[in-house]
């Protein structure tokens, strides 16, 4: 899947090669539920995912927030994006957005990440 200035974007299945199985097991695959090729994680887990992405020097191009209401996933239309070329700053923006969202809205949300495998 190409996009975002020609960088290769990571889809839900690509995360299988990047993340430990335990994090994948706790993720919520959104493909069947709402038709997007993303994985959502609760706050504590998405922070761990961000740390792994940072270690691998991958870019966080943005992300979306979904509300969990029992088994129902609700689109919140809340999101952020990053258009720079510094993977550290992309990580910082994602981390700041997610932390602020969690502090202001609580634990009934999951976060998806739009990630590129290149910092070029």
Predicted regions mapped to residue ranges:
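Long, contiguous N-terminal structural blocks used for assembly/anchoring
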Residues: 1-40
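Short, mixed-charge, low-aromatic patches
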Residues: 2-8, 50-57
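Extended hydrophobic/Leu-rich segments
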Residues: 15, 19, 23, 82, ...
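Amphipathic protein-protein interaction modules
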Residues: 51-106
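Acidic, proline/glycine-rich low-complexity IDRs
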Residues: 98-120
């Amino acid at each position: 899947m190409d996009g975002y200035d020609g960088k290769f974007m990571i889809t839900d299945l690509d995360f299988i090669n990047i993340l430990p199985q335990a994090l994948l097991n706790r993720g919520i695959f959104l493909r069947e539920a709402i038709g997007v090729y993303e994985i959502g994680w609760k706050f504590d887990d998405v922070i761990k995912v961000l740390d792994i992405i940072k270690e691998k020097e991958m870019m966080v191009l943005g992300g979306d927030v979904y509300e969990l209401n029992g088994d129902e996933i609700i689109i919140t239309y809340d999101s952020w994006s990053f258009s720079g070329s510094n993977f550290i700053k992309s990580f910082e923006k994602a981390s700041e957005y997610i932390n602020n969202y969690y502090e202001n809205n609580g634990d009934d949300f999951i976060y998806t990440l739009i990630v590129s495998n290149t910092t070029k």
